[in-house]
């Protein structure tokens, strides 16, 4: 059994695509786009390359808030290109939060939920607002709100089950569960999450992290 597992692991490693191959291929396509004056395509390729470089490194890494914001901007830019006039977004981050630290890609599943689920029943007019400000001296207040379809009380209760009884989580809530699971692992009882949602009005998720780390160096480097 151990030998079969070892062979399977080797096969899996052999099947993986080297990230440098992807980066080099994207760069090649980008140069072709520029040679043909396809500036929009070049911009999209640049954003996609940045997303890939950011996401393939250690997901448990601590980064500066400003790096996480830049990643979210690129992600939302590509989603806007994909969905056209579906939504607009606004990010309000207090300047003094830029050099506070957060675990990378912690917010992405919540932003993705707003795009893919919150706006599932509309074709235009969606709005996403992300607010980041201090909570105490080193803590963070993070708010992700949308004006999408919203959720009923039963669905909200199901999400809170992920918080208080993670062993009972539903596979349909895997994105939210992953956020909660990581918050528990990184911050323990130093965080709080609130869900405010109403059918036809939208959803607001608030995360408050107390006593976060402050840094003046980008630890993603």
What do these predicted regions represent?
Residues 1-196, 202-206:
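Two-component histidine phosphotransfer core
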Residues 195-221:
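C-terminal end segment of the histidine kinase catalytic
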């Amino acid at each position: 059994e151990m030998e079969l597992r070892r062979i399977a692991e080797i096969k899996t490693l052999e099947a993986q695509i080297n990230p440098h191959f992807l980066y080099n291929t994207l760069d090649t396509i980008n140069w072709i786009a520029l040679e043909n004056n396809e500036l929009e395509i070049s911009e999209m390729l640049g954003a996609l390359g940045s997303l890939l470089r950011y996401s393939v490194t250690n997901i448990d890494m601590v980064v500066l808030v400003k790096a996480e914001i830049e990643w979210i901007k690129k992600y939302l830019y590509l989603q806007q290109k994909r969905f056209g006039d579906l939504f607009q977004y606004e990010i309000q981050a207090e300047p003094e939060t830029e050099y506070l630290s957060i675990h990378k890609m912690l917010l992405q599943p919540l932003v993705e939920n707003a795009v893919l689920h919150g706006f599932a029943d509309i074709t235009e007019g969606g709005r996403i607002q992300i607010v980041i400000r201090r909570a105490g001296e080193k803590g963070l207040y993070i708010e992700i709100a949308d004006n999408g379809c919203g959720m009923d009380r039963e669905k909200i209760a199901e999400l809170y089950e992920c918080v208080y009884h993670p062993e009972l989580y539903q596979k349909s809530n895997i994105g939210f569960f992953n956020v909660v699971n990581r918050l528990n692992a990184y911050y323990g009882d130093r965080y709080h999450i609130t869900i405010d949602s109403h059918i036809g009005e939208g959803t607001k998720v608030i995360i408050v992290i107390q006593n976060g780390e402050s840094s003046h160096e980008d630890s993603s480097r």
